[in-house]
């Protein structure tokens, strides 16, 4: 095993000299044995660049506490590899593929390197099939695609993680396939909550969790998405199954890349991001794809800094997505959850050929009513409702009902709201909204449409108001 010595330590970045000149390859894993407070640990670092003829610059994937100059470093001769296969189900891993849930050690039959090429062009397949989520606003106005990529865009605190947790809950129960969750740079508490909820709901046995949380060094946050993806790829390629990959949060992946880039001394580009932002995002996203063997359907939460969708990190992710679910602060301020913007959210399959004539026409009419209501809001604010035509008054009343009806109680939020969660089938969603836009329920009070499942629930709720 080739050995070197630490020459310089700057935070997570290590310069390591290999005297005999046999330099480790880019992305190779290096091992450093440390002894901090009598506790022996192995720190793993990943080679990023070669500097000069005898040295490499590497990024540590765990804390560099206790490291000193001159310390010995071993070249493993291979990239970071993570365990794959059935043994990983129901467990939590870190970026290095080590279990962190205090459970029994796993028997590893196979490992795979986290750096892999994307499937070649002739291996790919494109199915256009709608993926039912049970969430009305998504299924109706911005449907997801089986084997596609979806982004959940939103600022801080508008409900991205809750929506992802509800999707995991709905899909794991209805879909029955394997799910892989990558926690990239998010709160440890949320990761813990998710694990406990999955255990309670019984879906943990079909799920792999891979965490690189906020408190970890940037190297771990940058690579944990690749570790999770490698596990998902194995289920797709070797078992030939449909896999669900959840990433929370893809912005933290870009943010960690920016930190690593700055530590490595690269010149920053727009808004201080790394010059390789597009390349890194592309390398990750191109591997999340469907092949002839199986599919990976991916849902990615994307934090939008300062609610600015033109920021390079979310803007870069946009290019890779089949559907976008935009969460709006203005809607969450009204108390409507999920706070999905029905006019900003988009989907590649929003056409009659895929959705069917009825679904497409209902969705477009809902959007038309909401858009007209939005256009009229200035007039209402300045002149009041009395200045509107009779038709517009009816439309505004209907739009307000639709707005409320797009809310839905979630299973994962039951403990906070006290309202039992609802899974609404796509056919029920289309039928319910068709009834509302037809004016069949204009006589029901607006509040009857708030936080219910299908139109039948709204009718039932309205009876309580009449009484």
From Swiss-Prot:
Chemical reaction(s) catalysed: ATP + H2O + 4 H(+)(in) = ADP + phosphate + 5 H(+)(out)
EC class: translocase
Protein family: Belongs to the ATPase alpha/beta chains family.
Binding site for ATP: 154-161
MF-aspect GO terms: ATP binding; ATP hydrolysis activity; proton-transporting ATP synthase activity, rotational mechanism
Predominant subcellular localization, coarse grouping: membrane
Intrachain disulfide bonds: none
UniProt cross-references to InterPro entries, sorted A to Z: AAA+_ATPase, ATP-synt_VA_C, ATP_synth_F1_bsu, ATPase_a/bsu_AS, ATPase_alpha/beta_chains, ATPase_F1/V1/A1_a/bsu_N, ATPase_F1/V1/A1_a/bsu_N_sf, ATPase_F1/V1/A1_a/bsu_nucl-bd
General function of this protein: Produces ATP from ADP in the presence of a proton gradient across the membrane. The catalytic sites are hosted primarily by the beta subunits.
Keyword terms: ATP synthesis, ATP-binding, Cell inner membrane, Cell membrane, CF(1), Hydrogen ion transport, Ion transport, Membrane, Nucleotide-binding, Translocase, Transport
Membrane topology: Peripheral membrane protein
Subunit relationships: F-type ATPases have 2 components, CF(1) - the catalytic core - and CF(0) - the membrane proton channel. CF(1) has five subunits: alpha(3), beta(3), gamma(1), delta(1), epsilon(1). CF(0) has three main subunits: a(1), b(2) and c(9-12). The alpha and beta chains form an alternating ring which encloses part of the gamma chain. CF(1) is attached to CF(0) by a central stalk formed by the gamma and epsilon chains, while a peripheral stalk is formed by the delta and b chains.
Full protein name: ATP synthase subunit beta
Gene assigned in the entry: atpD
EC number: 7.1.2.2
GO CC list: plasma membrane; proton-transporting ATP synthase complex
Phosphoprotein as UniProt keyword: no
Presence of keyword Transport: yes
Localization terms from the record: Cell inner membrane
Protein source organism: Leptospira interrogans serogroup Icterohaemorrhagiae serovar Lai (strain 56601)
Pfam family, one: ATP-synt_VA_C
């Amino acid at each position: 095993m080739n050995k070197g010595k630490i020459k310089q330590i700057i935070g997570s970045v290590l310069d390591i000299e290999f005297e005999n000149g046999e330099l480790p390859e880019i992305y190779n894993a290096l091992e450093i044995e440390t002894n901090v407070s009598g506790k022996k640990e192995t720190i793993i670092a990943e080679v990023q660049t070669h500097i000069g003829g005898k040295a490499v610059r590497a990024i540590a994937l765990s804390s560099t506490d206790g490291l000193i100059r001159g310390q010995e470093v071993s070249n493993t001769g291979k990239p970071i590899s993570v365990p794959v296969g059935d043994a990983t189900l129901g467990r939590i891993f870190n970026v290095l593929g080590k279990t962190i849930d205090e459970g029994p050690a796993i028997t590893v039959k196979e490992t795979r390197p986290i750096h892999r090429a994307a499937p070649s062009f002739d291996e790919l397949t494109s199915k256009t099939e709608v993926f039912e989520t049970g969430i009305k606003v998504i299924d109706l106005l911005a449907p997801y695609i089986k084997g596609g990529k979806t982004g959940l865009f939103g600022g801080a605190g508008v409900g991205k993680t809750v929506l992802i947790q509800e999707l995991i809950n709905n899909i794991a129960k209805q879909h029955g396939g394997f799910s892989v969750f990558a926690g990239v740079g998010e709160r440890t508490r949320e990761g813990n909550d998710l694990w406990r909820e999955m255990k309670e709901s019984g879906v943990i046995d079909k799920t792999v969790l891979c965490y690189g949380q906020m408190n970890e060094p940037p190297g771990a946050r940058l690579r944990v998405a690749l570790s999770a993806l490698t596990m998902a790829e194995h289920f797709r390629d070797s078992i030939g199954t449909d896999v669900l990959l959840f990433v929370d949060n893809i912005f933290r992946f870009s943010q960690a890349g920016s930190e690593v880039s700055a530590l490595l001394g690269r010149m920053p580009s727009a808004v201080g991001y790394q010059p390789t932002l597009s390349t890194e995002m592309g390398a990750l996203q191109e591997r999340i794809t469907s092949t002839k063997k199986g599919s990976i359907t991916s849902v990615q939460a994307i934090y939008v800094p300062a609610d600015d969708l033109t920021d390079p990190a979310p803007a870069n992710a946009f290019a890779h997505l089949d559907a976008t679910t935009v969460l709006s602060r203005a809607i969450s301020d009204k108390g409507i959850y999920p706070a999905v913007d029905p006019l900003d959210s988009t989907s590649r399959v929003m056409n009659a050929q895929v959705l069917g004539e009825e679904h497409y026409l209902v969705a477009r009419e809902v959007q038309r009513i909401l858009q007209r209501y939005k256009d009229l809001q200035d007039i209402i604010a300045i002149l009041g409702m009395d200045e509107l035509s009779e038709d517009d008054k009816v439309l505004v009343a209907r739009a307000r009902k639709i707005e409320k009806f797009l809310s839905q109680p979630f299973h994962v939020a039951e403990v906070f709201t006290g309202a039992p969660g609802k899974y609404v089938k796509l056919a029920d969603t289309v039928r319910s909204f068709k009834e509302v836009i037809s004016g069949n329920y204009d006589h029901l009070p607006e509040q009857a449409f708030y936080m219910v499942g299908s139109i039948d629930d709204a009718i039932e709720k309205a009876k309580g108001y009449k009484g």
